[in-house]
């Protein structure tokens, strides 16, 4: 199977990044062909298993002139909080990741796309790839973003209703998150 994993964050520096990297490693051991799209800076050194295609989307660049967007308020590197993103930043985020997704899908031709975090990027991917299998992995902090930034999620997320309908049921709810899921998905 050809698997494309996507994250807006660095694939080594946080729990979800390590989870992505280890999932890629596990799929490689099972013999799957893979590629990864991730948001990084040009200074980052990304180490994925040999043979895994890497397609960076660069922050602190003309395309995305701000630090990496982080799901947590405190990240282990300089980051942008989603709640402070202005509409022009959201537009640049959508343009950069949206074009990368379309380019990589055309080139790599995945059977399935796995999005890490059910927030802005997952909704963009779902909107761009309406006829493809798109799986979402919930890491918990994405639920917090939806809860603490409901206006941003509702107004600035393209395809938000469809993303919630298609992807939120894939969440593994815990510690009261199931009520949040019901409110958000309904």
Label for each model-derived stretch:
Residues 164-186:
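A short, active-site helix/loop in glycosyltransferases that binds the activated sugar's phosphate group
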Residues 42, 120-121, 172-174:
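Alpha-helix capping/helix-boundary segments
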Residues 1-58:
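N-terminal subdomain of nucleotide-sugar transferases
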Residues 38-100:
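A conserved catalytic-core segment of Leloir-type glycosyltransferases
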């Amino acid at each position: 199977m050809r698997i494309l994993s996507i994250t807006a964050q660095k694939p080594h520096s946080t729990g979800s990044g390590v989870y992505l990297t280890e999932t890629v490693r596990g799929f490689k051991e099972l013999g799957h062909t893979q590629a990864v799209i991730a948001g990084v800076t040009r200074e980052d050194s990304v180490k994925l298993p040999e043979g895994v295609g890497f397609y960076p989307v660069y922050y602190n660049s003309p395309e995305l002139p701000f630090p990496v967007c982080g799901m947590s308020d405190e990240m282990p590197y300089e980051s942008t909080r989603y709640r402070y993103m202005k509409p022009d930043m959201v537009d640049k985020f959508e343009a950069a990741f949206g074009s990368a997704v379309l380019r990589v899908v055309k080139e790599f031709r995945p059977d399935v796309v796995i999005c890490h975090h059910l927030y802005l990027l997952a909704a963009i991917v779902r909107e761009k790839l309406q006829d493809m299998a798109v799986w979402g992995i919930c890491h918990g902090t994405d639920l917090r973003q939806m809860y603490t930034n409901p206006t941003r999620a509702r107004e600035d997320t393209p395809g938000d209703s469809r993303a919630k309908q298609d992807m939120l049921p894939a969440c593994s709810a815990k510690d009261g998150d199931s009520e949040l899921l019901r409110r958000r998905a309904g």
